[in-house]
């Protein structure tokens, strides 16, 4: 919904959690699981690459969602000026970013963002450190 949706970080996180749960939220099926499955299946990778987007190898785009099959596997909804909703299904993780980039398209920020998310996921997989203090 380019320039047509206004949501708080919490609301976007709820949408992400619903997508993570294959369309379920608040104890009920909100959208059919088959619709979510279709969204996250992604589009034609070769057509995506032929479109000239070179910084997202292996990704695809379908039905307003960007799909990354590379580790850590994710799908994302990206809005103008840096608004982002990332879902990492293998890690049960939803990340919301509300940005204020000076340009409406901030695609090159996806590279450092995805690296940061990969580092976050690696850290979350490690056991918690204890300091010995109560």
Regions found by a protein language model. Give the residues of each.
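A general structural signal marking secondary-structure boundaries and capping sites
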Residues: 22-23, 43, 124, 128
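Non-transmembrane alpha-helical segments in soluble domains
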Residues: 13-20, 36-40, 64-66, 121
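Structural helix-adjacent loops and short alpha-helical linkers that scaffold large soluble proteins
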Residues: 23-31
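Structured C-terminal helix/loop/strand segments within mature extracytoplasmic catalytic/sensor domains
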Residues: 74-134
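Stable alpha-helical elements in mature extracytoplasmic
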Residues: 8-12, 31-35, 113-116
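Active-site-proximal alpha-helical segments within enzyme catalytic domains
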Residues: 4-24, 83-99
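Solvent-exposed loop and edge beta-strand segments that line ligand/cofactor-binding
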Residues: 1-6, 77-78
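Active-site Gly/Thr loop motif
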Residues: 37-94
